[in-house]
Amino acid sequence: FWFDPNRVAYATEYIESKLVEFDPSNASEYEAAGKAYVTELKGLVGQVSELISTIPSQNRKLITTHESLGYLEAKFGLEVLSTIIPSLDSANEISPSQLVGVIDVIEDNNVKVIFIEAEAPSVYAETIVAETGIKAVEGLWVETLKEGQSYPEFLLDAVELIVENLRNTD
């Protein structure tokens, strides 16, 4: 859910309410911090929308290592046509027929970029790149923050990497 700032805002409000419940003497501090963060998250929705809007609609197709961008796809209009590992668990294996299926999707849809997540590099991606000539983009962080990174920085870094590599793929 972390690729949809509105869902993160909802979680923030829930956490705030529980903190107020458990520590009412500091309620005003929790409420002020929660309100400020939710406001920041609402602004983040606009930033992400604006960035993605710079990608021509025909270039918004992508392939990833595993199913991690569903909320980004649903909220902001990207189209994840296939994943190398068809689950959220990057430890899962892929069958040869599934690998061929991903290659077929790439070729049938003229997909130009495959995003390889930093936390779970895939040997399967190397095979796909070799077979299709698709551009491999490494370093997409989808599951964890880098040391010292905030959630808004995490989201914007991921979106900027995606936008940079999809914007001019014709």
Where are these regions (language model features)?
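Extracytoplasmic metal-acquisition and chelation regions
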Residues: 1-170
